[in-house]
Amino acid sequence: MNDDIMRKPPARRLGQQAFVLRHSPDGQDELHVLLVDPVYRDGYTLPGGSAEADELPHLAARRHLETETGLALPLRTILTVDYMARHQYPEGINFVYAGGVVTPRQAKAVNLHRPPPNIRALHWIPRHLLDTVMPSNQALRVHDAWDAWEHGAGRPLLLRGTPVPVR
């Protein structure tokens, strides 16, 4: 499905991504963000993809997160919005949703999850390494989402003026 969207994308992509953290498995208090290594581009990115026609944006983010990582998390808080002018891909707007900090059990399940063929691998990356594993625009997006998450600056997605329910 993602390959079709990349070959015949809509006029303006509406990207939906999830920002999910875990605590360092070595017992330190350092947080790591969940990233995917897609086959269709260089560098890692947040889990996510385009919303289908008439698909609610937060549910598109959840669908991509679950398909790519096995996690089914409620996603309703937007941490950042990133406009991308047409370049290698069509013009798009990317919404990043807060997935929160997963439990050790959830993190282990992600590590055991077999991603779909369009994802090479899943990685938990500490913040200080983001710039080494992601294209600069992607790393800037994740840094901005991380800052918003740390400061509680997210905003709920509204559907006709009403915050979406947590599901």
Named regions from a protein language model:
Residues 35-37:
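Short, acidic/hydrophobic/Gly-rich beta-strand patch recurrent on exposed beta strands
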Residues 23, 78-83:
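Residue-level recognition of beta-strand microenvironments
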Residues 46-48:
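Thr-Gly-centered strand-to-loop micro-motif
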Residues 23-31, 88-90:
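Short, solvent-exposed loop/turn segments that connect beta-strands within catalytic domains
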Residues 42-44, 114-167:
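Nudix hydrolase/Nudix homology domain
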Residues 17, 32, 121:
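Conserved beta-strand and immediately adjacent loop positions that scaffold enzyme active sites
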Residues 51-74, 82-138:
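Unchanged
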Residues 1-17, 23-25:
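Acidic, metal-coordinating catalytic segment for phosphate/diphosphate chemistry
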